[in-house]
Swiss-Prot record:
UniProt name for this protein: Probable aminomethyltransferase
Signal sequence extent: none
Organism of provenance: Thermococcus gammatolerans (strain DSM 15229 / JCM 11827 / EJ3)
EC number(s) from the headed UniProt entry: 2.1.2.10
Name of the gene encoding the protein in the UniProt record: gcvT
Enzymatic class: transferase
Catalysed conversion reaction: N(6)-[(R)-S(8)-aminomethyldihydrolipoyl]-L-lysyl-[protein] + (6S)-5,6,7,8-tetrahydrofolate = N(6)-[(R)-dihydrolipoyl]-L-lysyl-[protein] + (6R)-5,10-methylene-5,6,7,8-tetrahydrofolate + NH4(+)
Keywords: Aminotransferase, Transferase
Length: 398
C-alpha cells in the first residue's frame, strides 16, 4: 500500500506533479524544479519531508545500543543536539545515513531515509533480541515515522524567517543543534540542518495522519496543516516557495551530497560489478569514530588494508550533455566506473554528477569522459560543492 504524509491532500491540490517515491506518494514539483531550486539558492523554500523515518530510543541502555549500531560518537553532543552517523551491516556496507538527536533523559531520536526505516526497524529489533538472549536490556524502540511531521525550510532567507516565526537566530545554533520552540501554541523541535547545502532549519512534531496504517491513529492533521500554511504565510515577504522532491534532489547534488540508494546502499551498484558501498568508498569516513566498537568496523579495517577498489568522485561536464544514473565513465578509452547521480545544474546550467570509479581516478582535476547516448563526452573531476561557496551555500560571504 502506498504511503502518504500528513498533509498529502494539500500537496495533491497544489503540486503539478505527484508520484511515488520510495513507497511514498509525494510532491515532485509545484511550479517547476528550476524555479523551486533557484528560490532555495537565492531566497527560501519549504519542503515537506514527513516521509523521512523517525525512531525514538528510550532507556538507560539506549546510548550504549546506539553507539554499537552506528559509526559516529553520539555520546559527546549535549542535549538537545544531533550527530550525523551511519548504520552499517556486518560487511561494512551502508544500511543508511542518519541523524541521531540526544533529547536528554536517556532518550534519543533517529532520523533516517524514507526507504530505509522499515528495514532498520527490523534490524534494530533483531539486534535487541540477540542481546536479550544473554541478559536484560533497558531499551524501548518506537517507530514514529507515520506520527511525526517534518518540514524543512532552506535558503539564505530561512534565517530571517526563523526570527519572525520563533524569535531565534539559527546562526546561534551549531549545525545539527536543536531547540524546543513553539508556534501558535504548537510545540516542536527545531534543528539547524538540511539537505540542500544552504543555511536552514527543520521542525519535528507529532500530529494525526489521515493515512496512518493503523486506522485507530488516523485523524485530521490540524497542527501540520496550520504550521505549513503559517510558514508559507510568514515567508511570503521573502518570496518563499513550496518545493518538491525534484528540487531537493538537484539541490543536494549541487552541494555534492550522497543519496541513499544511489551513492550508499547495501545492494549491487547499478549494472556494474561493484560490491556493496562502504563509507570509505563514499567519502563518509568523517562520520566514523574509530575509538569504539560498532557493527561493520572489522570489515572496514580489512578494506583499508586491501584497498577500496572503487571510490566516489564528483565531476562536471566540459562538453554539452546531461549525465544520468547508470552511464559509463571512461578514461583513455577504458571503462573506469559508472554514474550514480547526474543532472543539469539549474544554477550553473551545465551537467554535473557523482560516479564510482577506480580508486586512482577518484581525485579532482582529472579529465574523464561520460558515455551519453553512446557517445563519449568530456568531463572533469572536481571537489564539491559544484557552486562557488563564497556566493552560495550555508557559509556564503554576506
Amino acid at each position: 500500500m502506498v504511503k502518504r504524509v500528513h498533509i498529502f491532500d494539500w500537496h495533491k491540490e497544489h503540486a503539478k506533479k505527484v508520484e511515488e517515491f520510495a513507497g511514498w506518494e509525494m510532491p515532485i514539483w509545484y511550479s517547476s524544479i528550476k524555479e523551486e531550486h533557484l528560490a532555495v539558492r537565492n531566497g527560501v523554500g519549504i519542503f515537506d519531508v514527513s516521509h523521512m523515518g523517525e525512531f525514538i530510543f528510550r532507556g538507560k541502555d539506549a546510548l550504549e545500543f546506539l553507539q554499537y549500531v552506528t559509526t559516529n560518537d553520539i555520546s559527546k553532543p549535549p542535549a538537545i543536539s544531533g550527530t550525523y552517523t551511519l548504520v552499517l551491516n556486518e560487511r561494512g556496507a551502508v544500511k543508511d545515513e542518519t541523524l541521531v538527536f540526544n533529547l536528554g533523559n536517556d532518550t534519543y531520536m533517529m532520523v533516517c531515509d524514507s526507504d530505509a526505516f522499515e528495514k532498520l526497524e527490523a534490524w534494530f529489533n533483531a539486534i535487541k533480541r540477540g542481546i536479550e538472549k544473554f541478559g536484560s536490556i533497558d531499551l524501548e524502540i518506537e517507530n514514529k515515522t507515520y506520527d511525526m511531521a517534518m518540514f524543512s525550510v532552506q535558503g539564505p532567507k530561512a534565517r530571517d524567517l526563523a526570527k519572525d516565526l520563533f524569535g531565534i537566530d539559527i546562526n546561534d545554533l551549531w549545525w545539527f543543534q536543536a531547540k524546543e520552540v513553539e508556534l501558535d501554541g504548537i510545540k516542536m523541535l527545531l534543528s539547524r540542518s538540511g539537505y540542500t547545502g544552504e543555511n536552514g532549519w527543520e521542525v519535528y512534531f507529532e500530529d494525526k495522519n489521515p493515512y496512518h496504517p493503523n486506522p485507530e491513529k488516523r485523524g485530521r492533521p490540524e497542527k501540520a496543516l496550520h504550521v505549513w500554511e503559517r510558514i508559507l504565510e510568514e515567508g511570503e515577504k521573502y518570496g518563499i516557495k513550496p518545493a518538491g522532491l525534484g528540487a531537493r534532489d538537484t539541490l543536494r547534488l549541487e552541494a555534492g551530497y550522497t543519496l541513499y540508494g544511489n551513492e550508499t546502499k547495501e545492494l549491487q551498484l547499478l549494472s556494474t560489478d561493484i560490491d556493496e558501498v562502504t563509507p570509505l568508498q563514499a567519502n563518509l569516513d568523517f562520520a566514523i569514530f574509530w575509538d569504539k566498537e560498532f557493527i561493520g568496523k572489522e570489515a572496514l579495517l580489512k578494506q583499508k588494508e586491501r584497498g577500496l577498489g572503487r571510490k566516489m568522485v564528483h565531476f562536471k561536464m566540459v562538453d554539452r550533455g546531461i549525465p544520468r544514473e547508470g552511464y559509463k565513465v571512461l578514461a583513455n578509452g577504458e571503462v573506469i566506473g559508472e554514474v550514480t547521480s547526474g543532472t543539469l545544474s539549474p544554477l550553473l546550467g551545465i551537467g554535473i554528477g557523482i560516479a564510482f570509479v577506480k580508486e586512482e581516478y577518484a581525485k579532482p582535476g582529472l579529465e574523464i569522459e561520460v558515455e551519453i547516448r553512446g557517445k563519449p563526452k568530456r568531463a572533469v573531476t572536481v571537489s564539491p560543492p559544484f557552486y562557488d561557496p563564497k556566493k552560495y551555500g550555508a557559509f556564503r560571504e554576506e
